[in-house]
Amino acid sequence: MGITRQAYYQAEKRAQMTAQATEQILELVMEYRCLMPSIGTRKLYWLIKGKLLQRGLKCGRDQLFKILKEHNLLICPKRRYTKTTDSKHWMKKHPNLLKDYSAVQANEVFVSDITYVESAEGVHYLSLVTDAYTRQIKGYKLSNDMHAENVVQALHMAMQHVTDRATRMIHHSDRGSQYCSELYQSALRHYGVCPSMTDGGLAKQCFSYQNALAERINGILKQEFLITRCQTMKELDHLIAESIMIYNCYRPHLSLNMNTPNQTYEQTKTELIA
């Protein structure tokens, strides 16, 4: 059966309009993918939906998923774990203060962890300190080893950014030798921060779960931002600094009602000062 000339031109026009709309949608997608190369579809949709409305474009999350799939732009999650914790040492381990405890404001609980990153020069170690309530990365240090002095520098950076704090401030980490060291513990005492650590004994299989937030932030940074292979450690350090800025400013979190870490902090800052 044939179709009328009018029906043909109408179909042609619809296809053309769809192609133009798709082009605009992909343009918005690439704006954010340039900042956050591996951000997933759900968060991407949240970021662009306001701009879609401004342009009069109708596109739901399922439609965005379809468009990304057609253009080979879906992100496949990566899972890789490398142990960086050495808990078999003689130094004092502190109890877990976060059992049945959740932060209710910014600068109340900081979580710390060490992860490995690579450049063409070899393997390096990245120490991070994150605010458990806002998900802000507050401090970091890139180094060639896991010595305590490097981890302490990440803590110093984090505490420099604390202008208003909870009455009781907790620092939570695994039981690694760096965090148990006298150097690190004396730094916590200097800042008046209570140490908290993952459990040992029968609970040792649950280390990862007990410091899950810190390890989750490691994963986000490595899997969504640090995907370009840098030639030197210095170049990698610049990339990390830039990535942390973008993460804090632009990356929404489901756990924060799709707000960014910085937005969450700004929302709570008035309460902290009051």
Residue ranges: model-predicted function:
Residues 189-191, 219-274:
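C-terminal domain-tail junction helix/linker
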Residues 5-105, 202-208, 261-270:
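Basic, flexible linker segments flanking DNA-binding modules
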